[in-house]
Amino acid sequence: MLDDRSKLLLKALVERYIAEGQPVGSRTLSRASGLELSPATIRNVMADLEDLGLIASPHTSAGRVPTAKGYRLFVDTMLTVQQEQLPTVQLMPEQPQKVIANAAHLLSSLSQFVGVVMAPRRASVFRHIEFLRLSEKRFLVIIVSPDGDVQNRVIFTEADYSQSQLVEAANFLNANYAGLTMEQVRERLKLEVDKLRGEIAALMQAAVSVDSEAMSGSQDEVVFSGERNLLSVSDFSSDMSHLRRAFDLFEQKTQILRLLDISSRAEGVRIFIGGESQVVPFEELSVVSAPYEVDGQVVGTLGVIGPTRMPYDRMIQIVDITSKLVSNALSHRK
């Protein structure tokens, strides 16, 4: 647990490093903190902060820089988001693809980092469902959409089922849940599982426990904008290996999509610092994200990707405002 003096010095160090990008020494920190402490006292506090893993000393400098752990403590307990005068912007109610592209561009232009938007997920409504036994504990689920599109999905279960049990489960789903999305079916099954025979309930839960990507038949689309902005960020431009890793992430998309999917399950803005998420193990990269809605339902996520040395207070405002603009534009689309 940090005392007040240590917190003030850590806060001053993080803010100075974010602003200037240079390791912060004890004399600079003494001036920045406003505390009447000797450089020797500040050095002792900095040594304690370093022992706690909150700051680190680059080999080429006597100053200190925040670690991902230090940034996290700063963001969670010390960051004050003051209302900043952002440019007046508006996203017009248009086709979803255009709203998404405009939002990604807006995020990158306001942040001067990379804007990212996960496109709205299509709700996978089914009209008819069938189960076919392929082998022991392995079954084919056939789902027919209202438009007549057919999706096939192989599932594996802990127990084995006879064809008569498969027919019984399919008949129950078709009679009670046809016309609903898979998400709605999942929610209904949670409430009604006690009323169903155990083996049938387990089979139906296995059938619908697939993500929207699999059932829609297409990968979630993710739109990036402003990737070249990272070329102007010293944290990346000074180390080509960092740039290559960042652009590999943007090209492959999978890890970014997983991170955005995690964010979609939370309320409000989320901040992922460095490699703490385990999904994007990149110590020099942070993501500030927030979900957006259509008619009150979360359908996607957007955010800003940049260096861990980013002005988090400003990024939070940019992401929060953009998520509200996108929600409004998509909800009021004619």
Curated annotation (Swiss-Prot):
- Keyword Nucleus (UniProt): no
Molecular-function GO term, any one:
DNA binding
Which keywords fit this entry according to its UniProt record? Repressor, Stress response, Transcription, Transcription regulation
Kindly give the InterPro entries that the UniProt entry links to this protein: GAF-like_dom_sf, HrcA, HrcA_C, WH-like_DNA-bd_sf, WH_DNA-bd_sf, WHTH_HrcA_DNA-bd, WHTH_transcript_rep_HrcA_IDD
What's a Pfam family in this record?
A: HrcA_DNA-bdg
Keyword check for 4Fe-4S, yes or no: no
Question: Biological process (GO) annotations?
Answer: negative regulation of DNA-templated transcription
Question: According to the lineage, what is the superkingdom?
Answer: Bacteria
Q: Which family does it belong to?
A: Belongs to the HrcA family.
Protein name (Swiss-Prot/TrEMBL): Heat-inducible transcription repressor HrcA
- Organism listed in the record: Acidovorax ebreus (strain TPSY) (Diaphorobacter sp. (strain TPSY))
Name of the gene: hrcA
